């Protein structure tokens, strides 16, 4: 049983959760809003950031400048179909996304989405824990480790799990505060 691998897997789960949190808009323009957007470009789902320069000229605008002008319509269509809820405005060369101030209702909805993402992160950490503990039990059954050593490893995995879930909770609280702050 390798505890460091379990710790590494849990760290990856936390990073993935933090990445998901970054894609939730908070009323301020951010290029990370578009990180999850994949455009169907020449039959391949392609990340938007590889097809265009994405900038934030001011606090409420995201500017998308495609490298290939012919992809402008595809990008616009993809953004419209996405769950961003932001209508793109196309001027023929660039696409602008105006980030409106969040309404109280939209803030509540975003907190719900955030809560679900946090729960997904916690579930991922728990799955890693379950896998690690199963591995310890198997090693104990196969007499590779003693009962005391197995108990110690399980306790260590549980401590890692608690620490990881606590980190996800801190990330959630920080992002929730960011969303709910007017």
UniProtKB/Swiss-Prot annotation:
The encoding gene is: frr
Matching entries from InterPro entries are given as: Ribosome_recyc_fac, Ribosome_recyc_fac_dom, RRF_sf
Q: Which family does it belong to?
A: Belongs to the RRF family.
Q: Which HAMAP family does this UniProt record tie to the protein?
A: RRF
Organism of this sequence: Gloeobacter violaceus (strain ATCC 29082 / PCC 7421)
Which subcellular locations apply to this protein?
Answer: Cytoplasm
Q: What does this protein do?
A: Responsible for the release of ribosomes from messenger RNA at the termination of protein biosynthesis. May increase the efficiency of translation by recycling ribosomes from one round of translation to another.
Gene Ontology CC, one term: cytoplasm
What Pfam families does the annotation carry? Answer: RRF
* Protein name in UniProt: Ribosome-recycling factor
| Gene Ontology terms for molecular function | ribosomal large subunit binding
Q: What is its main location?
A: cytoplasm
Residues in the signal sequence:
none
Q: For this UniProt record, give its keywords in alphabetical order, as a comma-separated list.
A: Cytoplasm, Protein biosynthesis
**GO-annotated biological processes:** translation; translational termination
